[in-house]
Amino acid sequence: MTQIATENPSTKSVSNKTDRKKGLSIFILLLLIIGIACALYWFFFLKDFEETEDAYVGGNQVMVSSQVAGNVAKINADNMDKVHAGDILVELDDTNAKLSFEQAKSNLANAVRQVEQLGFTVQQLQSAVHANEISLAQAQGNLARRVQLEKMGAIDKESFQHAKEAVELAKANLNASKNQLAANQALLRNVPLREQPQIQNAINSLKQAWLNLQRTKIRSPIDGYVARRNVQVGQAVSVGGALMAVVSNEQMWLEANFKETQLTNMRIGQPVKIHFDLYGKNKEFDGVINGIEMGTGNAFSLLPSQNATGNWIKVVQRVPVRIKLDPQQFTETPLRIGLSATAKVRISDSSGAMLREKTEPKTLFSTDTLKYDESAVENLIESIIQQNSH
């Protein structure tokens, strides 16, 4: 019995060592399996992708401003309202604009009459020149006869002197009338009535007054939704002052900020999978890299950091990457500027360019609402000219 009792501790020690070795082997095996699984997961699912959650929706916020000063009379749209290009958003009091327009019409009528009067003045001066030419010819004829009589001693010297003075006076009158005629002809320059400088100035003033009257109605430059309205009825607005913004849901993009270490294989044209926090992980959207900014976000900030100090700490910088979105995907799931998103870029194909290539000049955005049909004012101008000319 004593011998059996002395053998049990040794057996238990060997058994414990064996169990520990087995446990350690199992643990190491599990670590290897986890490591291999992670490596395989990285190779098949992560190697060809770069992902960031630092991504936000950007878009064009078209600021609506006034081109003329005035007081707000009407506001026709509020925040979140759908508007179309050309819709009247704000109306200014047009009393002063109408008065200026009426004054400009009167000024054009007066300018036409003055030019017409100038034409009659030229005709009168032409007649005066002709009359003075006749007077000079008569005076010269009288002087020639008196020269012959003076040689014969038939007239006195005083009559002869008067004849000479009459010729000089006729010459002076003729020169004066010619100068007056030339001065008035210089004002007309033998050009059509409408092209006269005085009338052109009056026409331009009338068009400007008409344009200012049209601009008292402030229109939406694009299709979109009203945002950031800060104008109030009765408010005095100045030229260029922001009244509200119009945001187009077709002019949006994603601004994704990637770490500089993630840009090594990132190229323009690479596909992007996007999840917006608004619609959750189950709703996936497509995008394409449209460009990579020429500087980090910190470099373009209002107060960029200064690293020329003794307490420098290296911080990984982030570079904005613009991702083009497909507007057709957002007809039923619209976006809002500033929404958060997660962007995952497939970088397996890195044959594209990192910088945009030079392209032919083109118009990216435009509006026709700032142009006005001038046919009405042109007809008005022609009517005023015809009514005040012979």
UniProtKB/Swiss-Prot annotation:
**Localized where?**
Cell inner membrane
Which residues lie toward the Periplasmic compartment? Answer: 47-390
Q: Which InterPro entries match?
A: CusB-like_dom_1 (IPR043602), CusB_D23 (IPR032317), MFP (IPR050739), MFP_proteobact (IPR005694)
Q: What is its main location?
A: membrane
GO MF annotation: an example: bile acid transmembrane transporter activity
* Topological category with respect to the lipid bilayer: Single-pass membrane protein
Q: Name one GO cellular component term.
A: plasma membrane
Biological process, per Gene Ontology: bile acid and bile salt transport; response to antibiotic; xenobiotic detoxification by transmembrane export across the plasma membrane
Q: Does the keyword Cell inner membrane apply?
A: yes
Write out the entry's keywords from A to Z. Antibiotic resistance, Cell inner membrane, Cell membrane, Coiled coil, Membrane, Transmembrane, Transmembrane helix, Transport
The residues forming a coiled coil are 160-190
The residue ranges crossing the membrane are 26-46
**Cytoplasmic topological segments:** 1-25
Similarity comment:
Belongs to the membrane fusion protein (MFP) (TC 8.A.1) family.
Q: What does this protein do?
A: Confers resistance to antibiotics.
Q: Under which name does UniProt file this protein?
A: Multidrug export protein EmrA
What is the species listed in this Swiss-Prot or TrEMBL entry?
Answer: Haemophilus influenzae (strain ATCC 51907 / DSM 11121 / KW20 / Rd)
